[in-house]
Amino acid sequence: MKFLSARDFQPVAFLGLMLLTATAFPTSQVRRGDFTEDTTHNRPVYTTSQVGGLITYVLREILEMRKELCNGNSDCMNSDDALSENNLKLPEIQRNDGCFQTGYNQEICLLKICSGLLEFRFYLEFVKNNLQDNKKDKARVIQSNTETLVHIFKQEIKDSYKIVLPTPTSNALLMEKLESQKEWLRTKTIQLILKALEEFLKVTMRSTRQT
């Protein structure tokens, strides 16, 4: 990955990444091609291993929140009821997005990852707004570190103008629809959003190992 400086990150997200840096693999164990050196600035480097560590950290936070919301009930965690109730089309990485071993294309894959994570930004805001106060901090951590991942991956995209950005109008209409749900359905929707983000990040992590 490219060199990134401390000022590029939100405080919480940067702290998480710095903690990962302390336990990252030694440079001698990093594969050739894991990052591009920028000799014009004396900035810290974040390798594929470290980015994978950040994704793992976010996945752990998501799983913990899902377990809390479902009280550890496996049926609750695996339910997709809210998907059919709302006709939600949450971001997902498909075979033709260039992120899988067969047909891998780094540029196309990174565009999909960034576009998808930016779309999740809206859904994570809904999640945070509808959680109890004692769970909002964890939601903010997930939000902040997801933003960090967007920033990191965006630096690797040649044509960043091709990133698909959600429109404010469509977001506003969808937010109104989601907020109008009954409380029990809002809770299921939160669970579904977290589950979808979890799967999205798992595919993202596997794709980072392709390079």
UniProtKB/Swiss-Prot annotation:
Residues 1-24 form the signal peptide. Gene3D superfamilies: 1.20.1250.10. It comes from Rattus norvegicus (Rat). This is Interleukin-6. Disulfide bonds join 70-76, 99-109. Induction: In pancreatic islets, secretion is stimulated by IL1B. In islets from Zucker diabetic fatty (ZDF) rats, but not lean animals, secretion is also increased by endocannabinoid anandamide/AEA. Cytokine with a wide variety of biological functions in immunity, tissue regeneration, and metabolism. Binds to IL6R, then the complex associates to the signaling subunit IL6ST/gp130 to trigger the intracellular IL6-signaling pathway. The interaction with the membrane-bound IL6R and IL6ST stimulates 'classic signaling', whereas the binding of IL6 and soluble IL6R to IL6ST stimulates 'trans-signaling'. Alternatively, 'cluster signaling' occurs when membrane-bound IL6:IL6R complexes on transmitter cells activate IL6ST receptors on neighboring receiver cells. The keyword Phosphoprotein applies.
